[in-house]
Regions:
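Acyltransferase
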Residues: 73-134
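Pocket-forming structural segment of enzyme catalytic cores
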Residues: 1-76
Length: 134
């Protein structure tokens, strides 16, 4: 669903379940977000695993996961994405300046916690690969 604005910048995300892919993350963690569409309901049969005031930030359905936030972004990527939105007049200079004020080494360091989901996901994949065929 279109939000009418952007969620962009380092934002708090809250775990809403006890999913293995988010294991080891604090109940509230920081992650970079950039989107203008909110996930307002999970697909049929899916479980919400993370969210914030902007909607669902993560869900799981069986052995498939989806997240709305961007744990893969480094400082350079976060800055380039924000500047690009200003260059394409998707957001005002004032809005982008506010985002760029938050693109700091401290926020990036805090957001690195979210990168744990990569290792957690690989662990699930390896476990699934080594399990006997059904």
């Amino acid at each position: 669903e279109h939000m009418g604005s952007y969620e962009i910048g380092y934002r708090e995300v809250e775990r809403t379940g006890d999913d293995r892919v988010l294991a080891g993350l604090d109940n509230r963690f920081l992650a970079f977000t950039t989107h203008q569409d909110a996930v307002v309901e999970t697909p049929p049969g899916a479980t919400r695993i993370a969210g914030n005031d902007y909607g669902i930030q993560g869900f799981r359905k069986g052995r498939a996961w989806g997240v709305q936030f961007h744990p893969e972004y480094d400082l350079d990527t976060a800055e380039r994405i924000a500047v690009k939105k200003r260059d394409h007049e998707m957001l005002t200079s004032a809005e982008i300046d506010a985002v760029l004020d938050g693109v700091t080494p401290e926020n990036y360091d805090r957001a690195c916690e979210a990168k744990r989901l990569f290792g957690n996901f690989i662990g699930v994949v390896e476990e699934t690969r080594s399990a006997p065929a059904r």
